[in-house]
A protein has these predicted regions:
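Extended, low-hydrophobicity, polar/charged segments
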Residues: 1-161
């Protein structure tokens, strides 16, 4: 397997595609959404997760609010498939398909272009923070820029409380 992509690779992708986004280096890995929000001084709702699923073996990136869980039944229904056909990608599969280590995965700039869904709770925000291409980095951008760059479809896929 090739070496994992890095935040430098992400920065090159940002520069090459004229994306308005900033990679924020951190002093240490923030293992939880709460840690990331505290270190960045933002609300936990602004932290986003980029999660890789396999739908009948095909990769699908799902971007969700960091404090919410993806409802696989709802996701499957949106895609028009049975829930059992939607699997969460393993860490090895995610690395192979995106190039990034789980916990550092940005919402774009992957090894392969990925079909992407974004939950409306994310698009309702102005500024969001996601994986920055390294365990000790976060990416800051607007939700509008996130949608523009990913070409994502907005779909309600978060578990409702």
């Amino acid at each position: 397997m090739p070496d994992p992509l890095t935040r430098e690779d992400l920065q090159q992708f940002i520069d090459a595609n004229a994306i308005t986004a900033t990679i924020l280096p951190l002093d240490a890995h923030t293992a939880t959404v709460e840690d990331a929000a505290r270190v960045l001084g933002v609300d936990t709702i602004q932290i986003i997760k980029s999660l890789l699923f396999l739908v009948d073996g095909e990769p699908l990136l799902v971007i969700n609010n960091g404090t919410a869980r993806v409802d696989r039944k709802q996701l499957a229904g949106h895609l028009g498939v049975g829930r059992k056909r939607v699997k969460f990608a393993s860490a090895d599969q995610a690395l192979a398909l995106t190039g990034y280590v789980v916990g550092s995965m940005p919402p774009f700039g992957h090894r392969l272009p990925l079909k992407t869904l974004v939950d409306p709770a994310v698009t309702a925000l102005d500024t969001v923070y996601g994986g920055g291409g390294a365990l000790d980095a976060m990416l800051r951008l607007t939700a509008a820029e996130l949608l523009r760059v990913t070409g994502a479809e907005v779909a309600a896929i978060a578990e409702q409380e």
